[in-house]
């Protein structure tokens, strides 16, 4: 395995649930610090990193709709949850002396900068980790879609999707011990098989922009850096 990173600019997608650890709600600071240390390791390798965090540990917009409420309002609440998570992760990174900026799709200048592609590219060029908050800024779009969109806008060479397991399996390995992990799939195979990697819009957007999706376990300390150098357990979704 090469010690040099395979990718120089990447987008890391982390779910809100990843930040809550074993808790049933909110943010486990120890977990946030550990994820931050993995990102810091990538930065020390010279990799430019953008991050999209979900908000499911705080609120899910679909929960409002399922109870008969307004989906748009619910999604706005979920977007605010992603901003809380982004600020928490930024705090963990700054404790490690990693220069970090939060760019929000929802304008709130007293708290963080507003997103623009120009600001993104500037901060990346200055060596900062850029955390994208607020999803796409629009209801009905998941943070997976936000990850694919921001990856395309920042010119990322790959999307790293940190999940609960170390890749894409034929079935849920926690429920079906005989499930097997795919080493490699195409974007179209993911769509045709209905594999729950990212939502359909996100996978399609990644495919249209020729961005590979690398699925790995976000719970393995040092796993992000290992995969950046070509090692580790993972599934690569790519048409190349």
UniProtKB/Swiss-Prot annotation:
Annotated catalysed reactions: UMP + ATP = UDP + ADP
GO function terms (MF aspect): ATP binding; UMP kinase activity
Description of activity control: Allosterically activated by GTP. Inhibited by UTP.
A biological-process GO annotation: 'de novo' CTP biosynthetic process
Domain of life according to the entry: Bacteria
HAMAP family: PyrH_B (MF_01220_B)
PANTHER family hit by this protein: URIDYLATE KINASE, URIDYLATE KINASE PUMPKIN, CHLOROPLASTIC
Subunit-structure text: Homohexamer.
Record-given protein name: Uridylate kinase
Organism of this sequence: Rhizobium etli (strain ATCC 51251 / DSM 11541 / JCM 21823 / NBRC 15573 / CFN 42)
Gene: pyrH
